[in-house]
Amino acid sequence: MITMALNFYKYYSRQIKYALHFNILNNSIIDAENKYINFQKPLKNVIVSDSMFIDTAYLLKIKKMIKSIKGVFWADFVLKKYYPLYSDYLKGKISNVGTDGKINYGEILNINPDMIFLIDWNIFNPLSKWLDKNNIPYTKTGNYKEPKFLGKMEWIKFYASFYNKYKKAEKVFNKIIEEKRRILKSLNSRSIKYKPVVAFFGYHKNQPYIYGKSHYIPNWIREIKGNYLFENVEGTNYHYIDRKIFNSRAKYADVCILDTMGEDIDIKELLKNNPHFLKFRAYKNKRFYITTKDYLKFETLKCSEVMEEYVKIIHPKIYQNGDNDLKYFIKVV
């Protein structure tokens, strides 16, 4: 079961360098709710709501971790990005245990999981209470609210630790740290006289939303000498914003990046449904981008490459090919 951690342990003999929302102390794992997680190793049956768990399994090539996945929330959407997991899902080897507001409690009992990995969203609070009542072990994850790119990436240590692969995760993570240093060293060796204004945002049901200035993407934008447009928005979470207010500000941004959140966006349809984009400075100057449908998983699988592509987008002139060889973003025009 899960027991509450004492706060002072969070800062004692800390093994985690960048992440703020989990810790590992003397082989003990502390999750996003500051709770010690006790479990039987190795895990053979797990249920996941956090796709970064799956990304970590593939990044570190932990076969036992992949094999242990027996249930996934939003499986129809999440597993399409992963093969052969999606094939296993279609064959009935992996179950869809729930979507927004609809939890398949019976299937959770059938799986009899050794651990459930839940994102620490409010929608999972009723499920958490039910799991406590039924003595089913679970842990809460919060990589999405880390204020630093490397903080989010460091969560690979959290997931890997459940499979005795902490050292493997640490080795991979340390290489990413070195890559980040290389990126910044190269950038800082150039004379950057102007810091472009960047609008990083999303759209859901034709409603724009923006991220707080402490989110890891705005922080990275600042670190690579860009100015985040929505500096007045606090926190790490996203916030819906009135369309007129959004348009009045975003139209003057030098760079626009639309986070598609895994959707396969048709650019012609996007511009047809949002003709105001055509009036944006970023569109007129051919600096309007959208993320690819698989972008989110590549934040983990190809972290350093994704970080560098932000530099290419914000400062294309310092690269020989500019922003013409992007893998994880698509130029709208």
UniProtKB/Swiss-Prot annotation:
Name of protein: Uncharacterized protein MJ0642
Pfam families reported in the protein's UniProt record: Peripla_BP_2
Record domain Fe/B12 periplasmic-binding: where: 45-318
PROSITE patterns, per the entry: FE_B12_PBP
Recorded superkingdom: Archaea
Organism: Methanocaldococcus jannaschii (strain ATCC 43067 / DSM 2661 / JAL-1 / JCM 10045 / NBRC 100440) (Methanococcus jannaschii)
Coiled coil: none
